[in-house]
Amino acid sequence: MAFEGYTQETLDFLWGIRFNNERSWFLAHKQDYEAHLLAPTRALGEQVYEALHAAFPKEPFLLKLSRIYRDARRLHGNGPYKDHLWFCVRAGGEDWTGRPTFYFEIGPDYYSYGMGFWAPKAALMEAYRKAVDEHPEVLEKLVKRFNKQAQFTLSGPEYARKKTAPSPLLAAWYNKKSINLQHDAAPDERMFSQELAQDIIEGFRTLMPLYTYFDGLCAAEMV
């Protein structure tokens, strides 16, 4: 199944599950979930994965599609269902949240995609800063290229006590506890078209040099 775009029914379901987060409502609308949210998200994920695999065949990428069911052990007062769905294209391994990962997520009032790693170990970020200190020119070249595009922005929590970066260009990158390069948007016409897949694929290709840089740090830290 090729990705043809999301539909208004996609958003209707997502808003519905946000405000009716209970089993009876979900079961009554399960066909809507499968047809208008799960199927197009799977198709989008497969198209993005196949394009990245073709462009970078040596990368050990795999596709992971989330479940709409929350972990019953971690509801914390929330309903049993998520009001969003995501997929990621990442390297294998269990501890993937500490490695760079390409992702897409859709909710009732937004969609987002990009690349980041959200739970890196302190030792990894220390190794990252050491690598920047020793060879700042490597990341500077990547950051200069990143700053020429407008599709993604740098985000992520920062250290309360600022760390001294080797150059002003790297200050924002050097002080992050974790790094996310993201594109956020409210529902728009792009989301309802086939062009969304190409936007994501081209964006991920743009981010690939940064992915390679951070993944190399992760690989070195695991040795």
Where are these regions (language model features)?
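A short, surface-exposed loop/turn module that caps and links secondary-structure elements
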Residues: 54-81, 85, 150-163
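Active-site acidic/histidine clusters and adjacent loop/turn architecture
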Residues: 15-68
